[in-house]
From Swiss-Prot:
Catalytic residue positions: K14, D140
Protein name per the record: 4-diphosphocytidyl-2-C-methyl-D-erythritol kinase
Record-linked InterPro entries: GHMP_kinase_C_dom (IPR013750), GHMP_kinase_C_sf (IPR036554), GHMP_kinase_N_dom (IPR006204), IspE (IPR004424), Ribosomal_Su5_D2-typ_SF (IPR020568), Ribsml_uS5_D2-typ_fold_subgr (IPR014721)
Species, as recorded: Shewanella woodyi (strain ATCC 51908 / MS32)
EC top class, as a word: transferase
Function: Catalyzes the phosphorylation of the position 2 hydroxy group of 4-diphosphocytidyl-2C-methyl-D-erythritol.
Binding site for ATP: P98, M99, G100, G101, G102, I103, G104, G105, G106, S107, S108
Annotated gene: ispE
Pathway(s) it belongs to: Isoprenoid biosynthesis; isopentenyl diphosphate biosynthesis via DXP pathway; isopentenyl diphosphate from 1-deoxy-D-xylulose 5-phosphate: step 3/6
Reactions accelerated catalytically: 4-CDP-2-C-methyl-D-erythritol + ATP = 4-CDP-2-C-methyl-D-erythritol 2-phosphate + ADP + H(+)
Family, as annotated: Belongs to the GHMP kinase family. IspE subfamily.
PANTHER family to which the protein is assigned, alphabetical: 4-DIPHOSPHOCYTIDYL-2-C-METHYL-D-ERYTHRITOL KINASE, CHLOROPLASTIC
GO biological process, one term: terpenoid biosynthetic process
GO molecular function, one term: 4-(cytidine 5'-diphospho)-2-C-methyl-D-erythritol kinase activity
Superkingdom to which the source organism belongs: Bacteria
Length: 284
């Protein structure tokens, strides 16, 4: 594969269809119950394998590349160290997802890097081994490596495959960065939602325990959600800032998007229980 370009590796966004905060552990981490679903919108990565062990990242967004702590480069380095491969890579990132939006952009990029380079470098790590590497980069990375919609609990490391309905979504992107760390450190965050079994969770009304706090702290999120909820059942994903509305038909979501005020941005995407990354991997 050396010096050949391998194009079009998707790094899809995810939505938290529900997010419950059960309690804060003594080590500071929070016990959660959440449901992840992929959507048909995300970043794209291209790779060229090299023989000199070097790692280079190019992007359509300069500050992504300038950050030496970039998750893509960290993922590639971890895979090199874990497998002792002498191969390197030149990587191109087409960044389409907002940073700090609660839709998993950085985590998804890291997962796609691990999956793609494991295949292109022929390092032959199993999916479980890749997920273990991914967990060192972020709690959400194993979900993207797993490649299937999943119920997660604990600190996000226990995954059970589920297949929620694949709605069309209108995802809106408020012009604000919400710090996940700040939200989880906030004394006003509810941390006492009782743990429920999966069947009960899947049949109950879905909500996000972080939403009320984020809406109070970030007026832009509140305004965006207030607008969207007039068109469809809507809530926040992750710790925000992105919010999403559920639609039965693509045209309904497109019609709502057409009404979007000029000071708001968003996109329409399809929920999918199999990651677009799986389809790309199958093409090798």
């Amino acid at each position: 594969m050396s010096n050949q370009l391998s194009l079009g590796w998707p790094a899809p966004a995810k939505l938290n269809l529900f997010l419950h905060v059960n309690h804060r552990r003594e080590d500071g981490y929070h016990e959660l119950q959440t449901l992840f679903q992929f959507i048909s919108h995300g970043d794209l990565l291209d790779f060229k394998v090299t023989d000199d062990g070097s790692l280079k990242l190019h992007s359509n967004i300069g500050n992504v590349v300038a950050d030496s702590d970039n998750l893509i480069l960290r993922a590639a380095k971890l895979l090199q160290e874990r497998t002792a491969t002498e191969k390197g890579a030149e990587i191109w990132l087409d960044k389409r997802l907002p940073m700090g939006g609660g839709i998993g952009g950085g985590s998804s990029d890291a997962a796609t890097c691990l999956i793609a380079l494991n295949a292109l470098w022929q390092t032959h790590l199993s999916r479980d081994e890749l997920a273990e590497l991914g967990l060192a980069l972020g709690a959400d990375v194993p979900v993207f490596i797993n490649g299937l919609s999943a119920f997660a609990e604990g600190v996000g490391e226990k995954l059970i495959q589920v297949s929620p309905k694949e709605y069309w979504y209108l995802v809106l992107v408020p012009d604000v960065h919400v710090s996940t760390a700040e939200i989880f450190q906030d004394p006003d965050l509810p941390r006492n939602t009782p743990k429920l079994d999966l069947d009960s969770l899947m049949s109950s009304p879905w909500r996000n325990d972080c939403q009320e706090l984020v809406v109070k702290r970030y007026p832009q999120v509140a305004k965006t959600l207030d607008w969207l909820i007039e068109y469809a059942p809507s809530r926040m994903t992750g710790t925000g800032a992105c919010v999403f509305g559920e639609f039965e038909q693509q045209q309904q979501a497109q019609d709502a998007l057409a009404q979007l005020p000029s000071n708001m941005t968003g996109f329409v995407a399809k929920g999918t229980n199999i990651s677009p990354l799986e389809l790309r991997l199958a093409q090798l």
